Amino acid sequence: MSAAARDGQEGEFDDRIDPRFPVFSAATVAETLPGPLTPMTLDVQLSGLRAATRVMSLVMAPGDVLADEWGMRAIAVFSHRPYVGVSADVLAAEQLPGWSADEVRCLSLDGSHVDALFPLGRPPSTGRLLGSAAKAVVVKRAFALLRRAKADTQAYVAAATAEHLSAAQLMSKSDAELQVRIRLLRDRIHQGWRLTGLWLIDSGITAATVQRAGLHVTVSGVGALLRSDAIEAETASLAGLMQNDDRLCALALDRDLDGVTALSPSIGAAFASAVSRMGHRGPGEVELANLMFGDDPAMLLAAAGRAASDMPQPVKPAGSEAKLYERMASNARASRELAYDTTVRFTHELRMTLRELGSRFLDAELIDVAGEVFYLTCDEAITLPSDARLRIKRRRDERERFQSLRPPDVITLS
């Protein structure tokens, strides 16, 4: 195994690179996980994403070499930033129905010059089916694994509602209760990523089906685990309400929600309703230290203001057969969106719980700023190490150093 960084620039949480799978790209995950991420996020979310890839590998016939790489580094970390393992992703796409190896290469490399995805040769295929035979095996395994996915997702959504605690309720909990809750929420987040991974497999099977109707629908690799259109759709809906009113657009761009409400109470109410639904969502929503729309509703308002001048054109109605296949694709996306949204909902529950714990650490003079709790790992937040301040300082300095650098979008061993 080799380090990606040179000249002593390797981060504490960096992965090592197997020279048989040497190419990694941040292109397909940078929007949702725009690092450098905090240690807490790296600990909780990256382990959750790896739980998802391990579940996905159950439906593949990858062989031992690819299975190990897929489970450990399908999504890797370098300089506190997530990178997709392009070499492994391409091999997976060759097996999974509805996945496109060409799109994986195109979106991941985005014009970057890479000499070879497999400079040591493609991994041996011993014990691994190829081509259509592999895809047939995958479909059979997927249907068996997906049999309970809908019921499990519904139960997961119900748990998110049942286990929600307000800020006031969190304040009333003991330290021990908060510690138990942190463990529970970490497990819930991992459960959500596993469900999202299953629905990504389902999306691929659906994509392979609708391609028969001439619709170009593909899964463009494991980075699609982090793809969500919910914020864009909500923003576009709100932008449509303001599209023809320059005054409202100007107020939105100025983040003046009171001004928008005074000028149009109905639009103000629409924004309030959107924030109540989407308060757990926001820019870089998988990063635990980030603010969400519920913390700062003006972020959603400003996004809608920016979108109001660039509304999409109406789509020409399709024929009945195309509509049927479009509904199939839409239903597959909706299931994955629901699993993803609920994972983000549990992420926000953990975010709020960690904020409360950080405030208590600050009151006890165990840390200097409440937000420093995000520079601990999950286990360290539950059982605070004696050298917590030193760890936090070292990790904060390291993250700030990475923030000042411009890491490459594509990493490969030379």
Which residues make up each language-model segment?
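Contiguous hydrophobic, helix-prone segments at protein termini
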Residues: 2-414
